[in-house]
């Protein structure tokens, strides 16, 4: 997208929006956008690395899918969980997750929903009751009063949904939306529908939490031989918002860290493709914002 006259960047729908693999190839051939020196892989820091003075240590996890029992949680100040903390968003699962959060020693815990948190998506639940009663029987048989305020079960964290919070001077924004995939929660068509959500992200955000990846950063699905990240999310991150950290999950195969030299991109999916919770939490230190 172009720039408006007064300097504010406006993102428009990318011409390759609907085909992320083609978009990746196009931008690589024409701009080397996803190759060194523009981007490179980053090794996670060991857990016993001393935290530098004047820094805050973030611990990133995602896609724990109710399998939190065996996860070794490292030292840190702030926990970031990028969604899919349940299988279906059942209240019993949410309570179990909240209990797990309550036992963790982090000073702050920030959580967003993912496509598996079906009950958190009010539009999804309204449609499910009307149409596809047998697809998720355990969800369909919930009464509205069981799930209407399901996010209030998350008493041990800050829950973000198209909203932000300032913690230790860091502005953190969280959003659950992902490109349509088999009709799960918070799924939207690629293009304008998703861009409308990313346009809600204000400038001046230090840490962006989304459930899924942007195009080209830890979004490769080997068995499909496809990139699946959102092109509009990438353009929003790189051209408009420019956070220090963009943390996500959603694509279990994409676990790991990359940087474009300004933003660090972390896919913190804890579960593997076979839903084993064996990818370790990722620790990331950020210098505290100057209190100007």
Task: Kindly label every feature range from the protein language model.
Residues 61, 66-167:
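Core catalytic region of metal-dependent phosphoesterases/phosphodiesterases
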Residues 60-62, 79-84, 108-115, 160-161, ...:
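Active-site neighborhood of phospho(di)ester-bond hydrolases with catalytic His/Asp-centered motifs
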Residues 50-58, 164-174, 203-207, 258-264, ...:
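Beta-strand-turn-beta hairpins that frame and shape the catalytic cleft
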Residues 1-60, 64-68, 123, 286, ...:
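Acidic, histidine-bearing metal-coordination/catalytic regions of metal-dependent phosphoesterases
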Residues 166-168, 232-240, 244-245, 252-292:
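Binuclear metal-dependent phosphoesterase catalytic core
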Residues 156-219, 224:
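Internal catalytic-core helix/loop-beta-alpha segment
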Residues 127-139, 181, 203-242:
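Active-site-proximal segments of metal-dependent phosphoesterases and phosphodiesterases across multiple
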Residues 94-97, 189-193, 223-234:
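Charged helix-capping and loop-helix junction motifs
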């Amino acid at each position: 997208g172009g720039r408006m006259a007064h300097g504010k960047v406006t993102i428009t729908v990318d011409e390759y929006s609907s085909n992320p693999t083609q978009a990746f190839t196009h931008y690589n051939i024409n701009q080397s956008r996803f190759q060194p020196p523009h981007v490179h892989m980053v090794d996670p820091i060991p857990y016993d690395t001393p935290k530098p003075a004047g820094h805050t240590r973030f611990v990133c996890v995602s896609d724990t899918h109710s399998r939190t029992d065996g996860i070794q949680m490292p030292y840190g100040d702030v926990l970031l969980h990028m969604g899919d903390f349940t299988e279906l968003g059942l209240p019993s699962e949410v309570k179990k997750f909240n209990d797990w959060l309550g036992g963790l020693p982090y000073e702050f815990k920030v959580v967003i929903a993912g496509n598996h948190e079906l009950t958190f998506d009010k539009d999804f639940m309204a449609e499910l009751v009307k149409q596809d009663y047998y697809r998720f029987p355990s969800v369909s048989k919930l009464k509205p009063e069981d799930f209407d305020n399901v996010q209030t079960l998350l008493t041990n964290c800050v829950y973000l949904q198209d909203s932000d919070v300032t913690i230790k001077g860091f502005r953190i924004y969280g959003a659950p939306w992902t490109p349509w995939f088999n009709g799960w929660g918070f799924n939207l068509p690629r293009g304008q529908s998703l861009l409308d959500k990313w346009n809600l992200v204000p400038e001046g955000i230090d840490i962006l939490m989304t459930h899924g990846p942007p195009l080209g950063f830890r979004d490769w699905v080997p068995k499909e031989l496809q990139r699946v990240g959102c092109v509009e999310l990438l353009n929003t991150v790189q051209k408009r918002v420019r956070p220090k950290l963009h943390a996500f999950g959603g694509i279990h195969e994409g676990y790991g860290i990359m940087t474009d030299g300004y933003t660090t991109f972390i896919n913190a999916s804890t579960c593997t493709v076979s839903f084993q919770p064996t990818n370790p939490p990722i620790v990331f230190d950020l210098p505290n914002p100057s209190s100007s």
